[in-house]
Amino acid sequence: MPNTLDLSGFAITLVERGLQGLPVAEQVDAFCRDVTQAGFRARRFNMSIGTLHPRHGAHSYVWRRDEGLATELHPRRPEGVSEGYLKSPIYRLRNTDEVTLRRRLDAGGPVDFPILEDLREAGMTDYAARLVSFGEAQQRDPTKLFDPKRSRPD
């Protein structure tokens, strides 16, 4: 497996599928299959998109290598966001200047997010997260969408 997670070569295909109007679920499933066929040993992939729906705050697409794709709707909560979200890597990325986060899970040391302990217990060895804004594909070269050296999305 490559030591660095370079997904830039997949960005153009991802954007092209989006421009073809393929449903998001099909795009996510195809992306995950492409990545694993290219040699990345991905076991789980999650993409969440915030919504403007009055009852649903977000829509998640969760792909697991052994199970395929599932979708989840996250209801808006009168009390605000869930405790799990507040303790998640994505919450951290959305509320700091960071754009990427990567953690080795096989090092045996403590982890800084509860989800990472769950993933470690499931046998996963690496975790990577990346914020991508909708405007990036239109404003920049699509091959740069997954560049870990990029600055925070606009």
Model-predicted regions and their roles:
Residues 1-21, 26:
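Signal-transmission linkers at sensory-effector interfaces
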Residues 20-68:
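Helix-loop-beta substructure at the N-terminus of cytosolic sensory domains
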Residues 29-33, 117, 134:
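A broad, structural surface signal
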Residues 46-53, 105-109, 130-137:
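Short, glycine/charge-rich beta-strand/loop segments that flank catalytic centers
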Residues 57-61, 73, 139-141:
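Short, conserved acidic/polar surface loops in the N-terminal third of protein domains
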Residues 66-128:
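Regulatory sensory and allosteric helical modules in signal-transduction proteins
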Residues 126-154:
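Sensory-domain boundary capping and coupling elements
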